[in-house]
Amino acid sequence: MRFLLCLILLLHSTVLAGGLQWEKTEVAIEAFEGGGKVPGELKFTNTSDQPIRIRAVPASCGCIVAKPEKRDYAPGESGVIPFTYAPKRKWGTRAYRVYVVTSEAGAPYEFRFVVTETRR
């Protein structure tokens, strides 16, 4: 009984903690030969009761550059992180990772980018 009570309290506090809620965590990109850079954005909302700071947005490949328009988001505030994919002229499908490091405790948010480059 005591274990169940502790588990309920733990889950309840986790839900209340909130954080950044993302519109999606997987991004599909299609790039075509001669088409140039492909823009996009990661959309989110701060569902916590605390301000959250975006500290860094590293990617597993230099072909993806993501730069937040601002760093600090108040509780309830929504935002976007624009990104650009620069085609590498490597035809086919590959996967990359983008991470969003915030002021929250724990691991950074992770996004999977599935890129398909097609030769015309």
Give each language-model segment a name.
Residues 40-46, 81-83, 96-101:
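Buried hydrophobic-core signal for structured, non-transmembrane domains
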Residues 16-47, 114-120:
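Beta-sheet-dominated interaction scaffolds and their linkers
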Residues 47-50, 89, 104:
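Short, acidic/polar linear motifs in exposed loop/turn regions
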Residues 23-29, 39, 64-69, 81-84:
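Short structured motifs
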Residues 49-77:
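Surface-exposed binding patches on compact interaction domains or structured appendages
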